[in-house]
Structures are given as C-alpha cells and as structure tokens.
Amino acid sequence: MKKQFLSLTLITALTLGTAGTTTALAAPHSFPVISEPSTDKQVIKRIDADKIYKNIEYLSQTPRVAGTDSEYKAVQFIKKQFQSYGYKADIEEFSFLSYTDPNLVELSVAGFDGEITANHLTYSVNGDLSGEVVYAGLGTKEELEQTDVAGKIALIQRGNLTFAEKVLNAAEKGATGVILFNNADGELNGTLGEDNDKFIPSVTITNKDGEALLEKLNDGVKLTASLKIEGAHSGEKTSYNVVATKKATKNNKATKSDIIYITGHHDSVAGAPGANDDASGTSVTLELARVLKNLPTDTEIRFVTFGAEENGLLGSQHYVDNLPDDDIKRTIANFNLDMVGSKDAGDLVILTNDGEMNLVTELAQASSTRLNGEPTPYGQGGRSDHVSFAEAGIPAALFIHSPSEPWYHTPDDTIDKISKEKLQDVAEIVGTAVYDQAKIEAKKPDFNHKKGKKVKVPHLFGEKEFK
C-alpha cells in the first residue's frame, strides 16, 4: 500500500432516502443479496484466524520487494497454499523497470560553514564530480538561458516545474549536476518519475541549507561543491501474480458465469517485512480461497495475489490489461484486501476509486450489518490494486483499516503487531459478502438495509512527490 493515511472525517450518515443524492448506485445486479443467517454460517464456521496468522508469519519473515528472490519465495509459498486447497494455481510473470537506491550520497561545499545533508532523487544517476555552484532560480528554461551553468552545479529551488524538468533543463545547458532545495521546512524526498539517460547527478537539501547557500552566493562568495552518488541502478526485473480459480459448480450452460475477484498484493517495500502491508491481505485471500473451495456457487471466483503493487500497481495493471474482453464483461466485482490486520490501525473502511457506492460496497455493507449490527463506512481512495479493476469499468473496492499504524512501511511492520480479531472480522465480512452474490439460486437482491456512513479520507496516500 502506498503512503500514509490521515484521519477519517465523518461527512454524513446516509439513509435510504438520501442515498440517491449522495451515491451512485450500480446496475441492478449490484444490489446486495440479504442472506439467511444459516448461509452466513456456512462461511463463518470455516474461517480460521489462526491459519491466516500463520500464513502472515511465514510471509513476513523478510521483506518481499518486487523482483527479488524473497518475492519469488513468497510466490512459491502462495502457489503451494492454493494447491493444498485443491486449486490449480498459475504464476503469471511480467517485467518492469526498477530503480535501486544509491548506497552512498555525499555533498560538501567549500566556502560554506557547516554540514549539509543531501538526499537522492529516485532515478537520479550516479556520479562523482566537483564544480562551481551557481543559482538558477526555479530551473525554468528562461532562467537557465540567462545563467551560465555549463560545467557547473546548478542550485535550483523547488516549485512550479517537476524535478525532472528542472534537471533536464539544467542538463540541456551543460550543467554537470543539480542541487535542489526545498521551498518549505524539512527534508525533500522526491522522484524524477522514470529512467532517462539525459539525467545528471542530482540531490536534494533542506530549505534552510539552500537559503544559506544562496545567501553566500548573493554576498559574492564563490562556492565549489563536490557531489558523489554511488550504487544507483535502473534495470528490468521480473515480478509475479499468482492466480487460483474456483469454477462455478453450477450454471446455465448456455451462458458463461459471472466472475468475482478477491485480491491482495504479496510484495512489500524495501526494509519492511510487510506483515500488515500486505501479507495480511494476501493471507486473508488465501483463507477465503480455502473456505469457499467446496461451497456450491454459480459464479466463478478468482483469487489473485499481485506483485509490484508498491511500484505503482504494476501487477494488477498487467493482469487487467491482459484480460480478454469477455472476462472483463463477465466480471462483476473486485474485493481488494490491503492492510487488514494491524492491531493498532483504526477501523475498517471500504474505499472506491470514485468515492461512490457499487456492488462491492453494497454487498459488504449488507454483510457487516448482519454480522456486526452496523454497515462498514465507505469513502474515496485509490493507490491500491482495486484501481486497476475500476479503471476497466469493474465495480471494485479496497478493504483497509484507517488511520494506518505508525510502523507502516517501516522495519517494524512485523507479525507481533497483527490482530487475529481484525483478520477474522475482515474475512467474515468479505467472505459472506462474496458468497451472497456467488451462491446458487441467490435471492433476488433486496436493497432494504441500513446505509453506512460516508467518510472522507483526504489525501489518503501521500504520493511520492514530483514537484
């Protein structure tokens, strides 16, 4: 899952009478089936939080960065688990461009008192150089036309243009390196967006250090900087999706069955064991595959764990992009599970890419009302694999706890922070919701259920900054 949650803020409690003005309801098949308690029990009695926990424990022994041996080990484990439940599991490979962070970033400036801490920009290139420091404003083409940066290191302030544009503008005028300084307090972390052989070595510094350098230059002090970046690398890597399919046990042979997806992502960020992000979602996906395997359905259910989610939803994008048109037309729902087990995260929310209700939110709210007495709140949020399905026109939603835990994307995202109770709750809500729609001879959808609260999650994930 990508970047940090902010707190939930209640907008309004939706009622049946106001639903038409505040939510966009999906096509008729998207209304929820109201189950008998005995139907829910068929799913609930099979769910075992201990099994989910054990799978998380195995997966979170080490980070599972996309394209690494540890990811491949996790993929093999997931495949074996699916097979142990009686599925034919397939591994789907895809290639992607990956960037390895440098292991050394150094900046020193002769003529400047004090130490400067420099950070790299993602996709910045390696280099070992020295040169005179010259100020080039915001790094616009116009400013660089008026500044002699040839053979020099350009000092550029953040703002207006992307980091990549600033670096390329400086490179075009012959600069050998770039020092970008923040326009606000604090360190500056950012990305150049993609690999480009025209990039030159570039680092970022704080606003305080940048303004201090600029003050020296304005006072007529000549500054010479030495800049070194080592270990950065861009190259093609391979990641994987794992797919297991439960065929419909009964359906009209004249037509193909509908398809429902239950998904999670098995990769993690570098340095983080990813127990919650997202070994939890992967393990609940595995458990629901086990639970639903022998229950009769007239709907096809596909269980997928995606790779390279942390690199930009690459696995799910690859998967959905390569689905046949007929499969997309038959797909009626994607239940995406990401970060669903942390004991110190907030409450469960259901997030759609556009913030509107759809089949998934309807089914899940009906399910959570039956199980917990209240419908799970919903809101708007992207930055997880449900987006790839939503962009293909498929009703999709993310199940996640918010606000997130303090150790999100850190080495402390470990198994001891996982709550079996939260795992059980999510598995029950999603499992019964899916079975409502998938079971044979499901009742005609009934929309007479209490509506959940709509919540706002502003800036749900702080994207890597480009400007």
Regions found by a protein language model. Give the residues of each.
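Sec-dependent N-terminal signal peptides of Gram-positive bacterial secreted proteins and lipoproteins
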Residues: 1-29
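Noncatalytic luminal/extracellular "stalk/propeptide" segments of secretory-pathway proteins
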Residues: 26-38, 45-49, 54-153
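Second-shell loop/turn segments in exported
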Residues: 38-46, 60-70, 120-124, 135, ...
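Alpha-helical metal-binding/catalytic segments enriched in His/Glu/Asp
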Residues: 82, 170-171, 178, 242, ...
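Extracellular/luminal Protease-associated
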Residues: 116-206
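Soluble metallo-hydrolase cores and metallopeptidase-like ectodomains found primarily
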Residues: 121-141, 194-275, 290, 294, ...
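Metal-dependent peptidase/peptidase-like ectodomains
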Residues: 297, 306-398, 402-404
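His/Asp/Glu-rich mid-to-C-terminal helical/loop segments that flank catalytic regions of hydrolases
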Residues: 406-467
